[in-house]
């Protein structure tokens, strides 16, 4: 799959206002995923055989350097890559301790304008 098409689908499915794509010009065949800050693990993803790395935050220099190494990078935002797991964590907490109150909290303080 084309990296730009894949990144667009990631954006749509996560509900992110935008994603950043460093397109290495290679098709998306194997994706490594890390929610939140993932800039330190790009080389590990590449060593594991990924041609595309999706994370919440990668950093400017990581993104500008990676395409030269033949790897597509997609930065989709901390909130948007971590939010999908919150309901799962809530269910796990309730399974461990059914009588424990466990509410989801979403901060709306930061917005892309």
Put a short name on every predicted segment.
Residues 1-113:
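Hydrophobic structural segments
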